[in-house]
């Protein structure tokens, strides 16, 4: 029987005073917009933006850098802010972005103060023309850290969480290129899957769809079922980006990476076919060819991607299964000291 997933609302207590107050978790609640303006020096430095929010450089505790995410003011988007706030207040994991503070006027305005990650996001790092190329050992470590973050929200939170928008631009990198999953505004909280009510019109269903071009699970687009399998599909696309260095979706060329990779993915899923080293190297990011990397590690990454983006949901592994596979089959990770996360 299909289970309906309802976004669970959590009570976030807030003491109203004229000064910022500290939650028991160490998260600071800012009680006036003046506090927010002070944190950002009156919003003097914009460092990022999305469809529904802008991100400003901020100073936390007077000196430490932080990132302030300000949501567009509207009642509907305030609900998105509340969802993300409620989730981040519950999450503590080394590979999930840390919430430092927040402002909530309980009506239409909201802001999240997040840890600052100096290396930006994974998409920017992979697509950058900089001479500083993200090395293979960093790429496999990012894959493991990301899937451990997904495993945490899928299996180790109560209630469980489906992120809903796993993509490389939602993977932030710290100074050591360790990754942090961010942006929980599209998350679903509760059971592992949901089915849209059968009485919902196609137009209404379309409005509720989440995801990003190149990353959205085709099964979700067809059925409206948001599940852990959807997150694993997005993870599989990110792995393809890590291996190939290509973007998930090129608006200029109208190409999706999953379509480019489809012939190779089909060969990998056909257990009777032994993929040649030449085919693997043709798909590999050419900036990595001079590295002395183990081609079997590349094959492992591609095999993981293939099962994660499979059209057969039964073939898609859990995050825990992928983490185990990477740890067992990619020797580079043992040298980096990567292991099972919290």
UniProtKB/Swiss-Prot annotation:
GO biological processes: response to wounding
Record's keyword annotation contains Transferase: yes
EC number(s) recorded for this UniProt protein: 2.7.11.1
Secretion signal span: none
Active-site residues, record numbering mapped to chain: 165 (proton acceptor)
InterPro entries per the UniProt record, alphabetical: Kinase-like_dom_sf, Prot_kinase_dom, Protein_kinase_ATP_BS, Ser/Thr_kinase_AS
SMART domains for the chain: S_TKc
SUPFAM superfamilies documented for this protein: Protein kinase-like (PK-like) (SSF56112)
Modified residues (Phosphotyrosine): 220
Keyword Nucleotide-binding appears in the UniProt entry: yes
GO-annotated molecular function: ATP binding; protein serine kinase activity; protein serine/threonine kinase activity
Domain Protein kinase: 41-336
Modified residues (Phosphoserine): 169, 201
Reactions listed under catalytic activity: L-seryl-[protein] + ATP = O-phospho-L-seryl-[protein] + ADP + H(+); L-threonyl-[protein] + ATP = O-phospho-L-threonyl-[protein] + ADP + H(+)
Alphabetized UniProt keyword annotations: ATP-binding, Kinase, Nucleotide-binding, Phosphoprotein, Serine/threonine-protein kinase, Transferase
Binding annotation for ATP: 47-55, 69
Record family assignment: Belongs to the protein kinase superfamily. Ser/Thr protein kinase family.
Protein name in the entry: Probable receptor-like protein kinase At4g10390
């Amino acid at each position: 029987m299909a289970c309906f997933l309802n976004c669970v609302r959590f009570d976030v207590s807030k003491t109203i005073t004229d000064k910022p107050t500290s939650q028991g978790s160490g998260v600071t609640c800012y009680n006036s917009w003046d506090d927010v303006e002070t944190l950002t020096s009156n919003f003097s430095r914009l460092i990022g933006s999305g469809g529904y929010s802008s991100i400003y450089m901020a100073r936390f505790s007077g000196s430490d850098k932080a990132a302030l995410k300000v949501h567009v003011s509207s009642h509907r988007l305030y609900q998105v802010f509340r969802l993300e706030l409620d989730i981040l207040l519950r999450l503590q994991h080394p590979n999930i972005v840390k919430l430092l503070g927040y402002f909530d006027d309980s009506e239409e305005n909201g802001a999240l103060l997040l840890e600052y990650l100096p290396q930006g996001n994974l998409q920017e790092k992979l697509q950058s023309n900089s001479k500083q190329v993200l090395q293979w050992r960093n790429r496999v470590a990012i894959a493991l850290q990301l899937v451990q973050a997904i495993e945490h929200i899928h299996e180790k939170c109560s209630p469980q969480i489906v992120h809903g928008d796993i993509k490389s631009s939602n993977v932030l990198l710290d100074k050591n290129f360790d990754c942090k999953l961010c942006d929980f505004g599209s998350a679903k909280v509760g059971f592992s899957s949901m089915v849209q009510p059968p009485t919902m019109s196609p137009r209404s269903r379309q409005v509720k769809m989440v995801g990003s071009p190149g990353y959205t699970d085709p099964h979700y687009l067809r059925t409206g079922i948001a599940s852990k399998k959807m997150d694993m599909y997005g993870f599989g696309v990110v792995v393809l980006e890590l291996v190939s260095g290509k973007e998930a979706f090129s608006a200029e060329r109208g190409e999706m990476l999953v379509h480019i990779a489809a012939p190779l993915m089909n060969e990998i899923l056909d257990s009777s076919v032994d993929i040649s080293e030449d085919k693997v190297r043709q798909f590999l990011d050419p900036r990595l060819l001079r590295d002395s990397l183990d081609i079997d590690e590349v094959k492992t990454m591609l095999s993981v991607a293939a099962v994660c983006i499979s059209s057969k949901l039964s073939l898609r592994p859990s995050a825990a299964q992928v983490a185990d596979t990477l740890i067992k089959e990619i020797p580079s990770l043992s040298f980096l000291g990567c292991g099972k996360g919290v």
